[in-house]
Curated annotation (Swiss-Prot):
It comes from the Eukaryota. Keywords: Developmental protein, DNA-binding, Homeobox, Nucleus. It comes from Xenopus tropicalis (Western clawed frog). GO terms for cellular component: nucleus. Residues 95-106 have a biased composition (Low complexity). The gene is otx2. This is Homeobox protein OTX2. Residues 38-97 bind DNA. InterPro entries: HD (IPR001356), Homeobox_CS (IPR017970), Homeodomain-like_sf (IPR009057), Otx2_TF (IPR003022), Otx_TF (IPR003025), Otx_TF_C (IPR013851). Residues 123-137 have a biased composition (Polar residues). May play a central role in the initial events of axis formation and in particular in specifying anterior head regions and their spatial relationship with trunk structures. Activates the head organizer gene cer1 by acting synergistically with siamois and mix-A/mix.1 through the 5'-TAATCT-3' element of the cer1 promoter. Also binds as a complex with lhx1/lim1 and ldb1 to the gsc promoter to stimulate expression.
Amino acid sequence: MMSYLKQPPYAVNGLSLTTSGMDLLHPSVGYPATPRKQRRERTTFTRAQLDVLEALFAKTRYPDIFMREEVALKINLPESRVQVWFKNRRAKCRQQQQQQQNGGQNKVRPSKKKPSPAREVSSESGTSGQFSPPCSTSVPVISSSTAPVSIWSPASISPLSDPLSTSSSCMQRSYPMTYTQASGYSQGYAGSTSYFGGMDCGSYLTPMHHQLSGAGATLSPMGTNAVTSHLNQSPAALSSQAYGASSLGFNSTADCLDYKDQTASWKLNFNADCLDYKDQTSSWKFQVL
């Protein structure tokens, strides 16, 4: 029973953690007690001491050592306390001056801010006065912009209302530049334009220029029964016109057009090999190969 009581309470790996054991493990390490930092006592000045110090501070903010010692003897305080008081008093004085300057600036700033809205209002009124004439002049601008609409509106309506007249006028304007017998040619195609009411005939009639190679691609999708039915009636107007090889300005170098005037017969051979155009005894015939 006594041996149980004498057994050390903490045993780690067979080593008893006692004070003697710690001393054996760390003989060179000392554990000195941490010295408590002595706090300097706060000096409390009486009213009489403050009056003496304030009187000296009013004379000079930076007293020399002799003046500080003299005041320290008067108020029964060490000279270091007097020196610290002057240091703190100068800092307080600077802080007060800074606050006064900031307060003065804060007072001046609202006075600056108050007229600034008035200036802004005056500037806004000035700008509104400057911009008000453009607002008044903008009405004639709108009227002038509406005027071209009223002028151009008949022109925009007329092509929609009468597409045949515009297409025929385009033909009459375009073909006299290339063909010598333009009047008869335009009259001959005037009848065909009535059958192409909703289409742009200029794109399909321009193959009569020297560029007929691209016309085969444009005319090839037109090999339909509806187009043939319309074209079967149009050669009467074309056959009534007399065309000579010398009257039409076709170049003999055009590989895509073979024009022959044999018993008033027309023959157009395209490279696309999709259209065989023959006019024999006033008959039109389209053969889609």
